[in-house]
């Protein structure tokens, strides 16, 4: 058995069911936080601006406009145990795989909806 096959077998156990989404989609990510001995869930909603990597190491970047119009970006590992669930709120229609140009645009961004 080669090392590559061994890695694939181990990764199969780690992969969990996640909805299909692409850059331009608006998603709501529920993240688990541990504060002392309590555990709570916090939602982070924004536009997916990039997907990178493959397999268990796949990550995605979500950007939203926070308080006072300041942009907030978070990079989430797709199969991390801290992610409780991912909901796709809106499907966006874009022509780029990486939406880094949204960083330079001030205010709210309008992305056409995909059917």
From Swiss-Prot:
InterPro entries: Ribosomal_bL19, Ribosomal_bL19_CS, Ribosomal_bL19_sf, Translation_prot_SH3-like_sf. Pfam families: Ribosomal_L19. Keywords: Ribonucleoprotein, Ribosomal protein. One of its GO terms (cellular component) is cytosolic large ribosomal subunit. Gene3D superfamilies: 2.30.30.790. PROSITE patterns: RIBOSOMAL_L19. One of its GO terms (molecular function) is structural constituent of ribosome. GO terms for biological process: translation. Belongs to the bacterial ribosomal protein bL19 family. This protein is located at the 30S-50S ribosomal subunit interface and may play a role in the structure and function of the aminoacyl-tRNA binding site. This is Large ribosomal subunit protein bL19. The gene is rplS.
């Amino acid at each position: 058995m080669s090392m590559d096959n061994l890695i694939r077998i181990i990764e199969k156990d780690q992969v969990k069911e996640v909805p299909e989404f692409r850059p331009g989609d608006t998603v709501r990510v529920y993240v688990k936080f541990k504060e002392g001995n309590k555990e709570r869930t916090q939602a982070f909603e924004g536009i997916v601006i990039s997907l990178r990597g493959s397999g268990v190491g796949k990550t995605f970047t979500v950007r939203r406009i926070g308080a006072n119009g300041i942009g907030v970006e978070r990079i989430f590992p797709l199969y991390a145990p801290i992610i409780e669930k991912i909901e796709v709120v809106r499907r966006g229609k874009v022509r780029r795989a990486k939406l880094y140009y949204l960083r330079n645009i001030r205010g709210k961004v309008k992305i056409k909806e995909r059917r």
